[in-house]
Amino acid sequence: QSLDGCIAREDGESHWISGQEDLDHTHRLRALCDAVLVGAGTVIKDDCRLTVRRCEGQNPLRVVLDPNASVPTESALFSDATAPTLWITGSTGADPGQPLGENVDILKLPCEGGRFALDRVLSALADRGVRRLFVEGGGFTITRFLKAGLMDRLHIAMAPIFMGSGRSSTQEALGQSLADCPRPQVSVYPMGGD
C-alpha cells in the first residue's frame, strides 16, 4: 500500500504499488499456506491466478468469496488448472452459465446482507484440511477478517509513494472510538525499496 494507506488509485489502478521484493514475498506466503483467499472484487479487478510462481513451493487451494456469483467464469482462477479453486457463492446465487474446469469446486453458503458468516467459511475450509489460511485481499475482505478478530498475523507492504486519494486498505471503521481500534505489535522488515 502507499504511505498514505491506499491500495489502488480511485480509478482502480494498482499494478504495481509495491516492488518486486514484496511480490516475491507474497509468493512465498502463498507457498507456506494451505489456502489463499480473496474476495470477488479482487478477482474481477485483477484477474489474479493466486499461484506460486516466483519461488519454490506447492500451489495452495485458491478460495474466492463471491456472495453474488459475480466473478466471470472466464477468470484465470477458473481456467488455470495448475491449482485447485474453491468458489464460495451465496446459497441463493445463480449457478454459472457454463461448465467450469475440473479444478473448480463450488460451495454454496448462506449469506446475510450480502456477506458470509466468516466462522462458516473457516469451518468449511477446515473440513477441507485447511489449517493455514492466507487472506490476500482485497481491502473489504481483509477488513472483515480484522473486525472479526480472525487474523493471527498481518503483513502490510508500505511502498514509498503518496497517492493523495484512492482506495483505502481498510473499507470500514475498525472501532467505535480510537480506544476500540486494534493496536497490534509491529515489526518492520525492509524489502527492497518498500
Locations of regions flagged by a protein language model:
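Enzymes that bind and transform nitrogen-containing heteroaromatic metabolites
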Residues: 1-194
